[in-house]
Amino acid sequence: MSSQDVLIHSDDPCHPANLICTLCKQFFHNNWCTGTGGGISIKDPNTNYYYLAPSGVQKEKMTPEDLFVMDAQTLEYLRSPKLYKPSACTPLFLACYQKKDAGAIIHTHSQNAVICSLVFGDEFRIANIEQIKAIPSGKVDPVTKKPMALSFFDTLKIPIIENMAHEDELIDDLHKTFKDYPDTCAVIVRRHGIFVWGPTIDKAKIFNEAIDYLMELAIKMYQMGIPPDCGIGEEKKHLKMASP
């Protein structure tokens, strides 16, 4: 086995090379990563290596041999598959690692994200929904010193940036959202999809699933005439009544 192949072969299902393939298949079946769209990157905390899904591979068929591996310090590729090129998302993934101290980043072409980007302006907003409690607030508990989640009564805000012809051209707007929304764990790209990050792949997956649930709910609320961020008890003021 070559030194490059050692990086991606493991019997551990939670090894980044195995986990990326497992999650890409799952996201394909969720209709989030079809037609080779989307991608995942995971930082291995044991080696400080970035594992990156390639460009142009069908996500449900991805294998560990398809993955790129990069040294987090030198940003040099330690492993490059012959059949594929690096994901166009790579500069965006690196920005999340370097500026947000992410441990993993998920990029999907979720239809819910795309529709929300057409309905909302500069930011997606939803409030007073239980699932919001799965999203980090960006604050730290003064007693336990642990990260705090948003509460039921909080408003989740996710910035929306404009799409570009090429994904690497999104980098300037991504850096701006880091500055304008320092507590966010996601950014929606209009007519494109969403990027979600977290301190670990488990957290990033939870955040991504919760946000997609909330976006789907917001779309249904919008169809009923209910603003997704309306106050508790105000729903019926906006509700579109069915014709008798």
Swiss-Prot record:
It is found in: Cytoplasm. Keywords: Amino-acid biosynthesis, Cytoplasm, Lyase, Metal-binding, Methionine biosynthesis, Zinc. Its cofactor is Zn(2+). The keyword Nucleotidyltransferase does not apply. Its EC number is 4.2.1.109. InterPro entries: Aldolase_II/adducin_N, Aldolase_II/adducin_N_sf, MethylthioRu-1-P_deHdtase_MtnB, Salvage_MtnB_euk. Pathway: Amino-acid biosynthesis; L-methionine biosynthesis via salvage pathway; L-methionine from S-methyl-5-thio-alpha-D-ribose 1-phosphate: step 2/6. Binds 1 zinc ion per subunit. Zn(2+) binds at H107, H109, H192. One of its GO terms (biological process) is L-methionine salvage from methylthioadenosine. One of its GO terms (cellular component) is cytoplasm. The active site is at E130 (proton donor/acceptor). Its main location: cytoplasm. Pfam families: Aldolase_II. Substrate binds at C89. It catalyses: 5-(methylsulfanyl)-D-ribulose 1-phosphate = 5-methylsulfanyl-2,3-dioxopentyl phosphate + H2O. It comes from the Eukaryota. PANTHER family: METHYLTHIORIBULOSE-1-PHOSPHATE DEHYDRATASE. Belongs to the aldolase class II family. MtnB subfamily. NCBIfam families: salvage_mtnB. Catalyzes the dehydration of methylthioribulose-1-phosphate (MTRu-1-P) into 2,3-diketo-5-methylthiopentyl-1-phosphate (DK-MTP-1-P). This is Methylthioribulose-1-phosphate dehydratase.
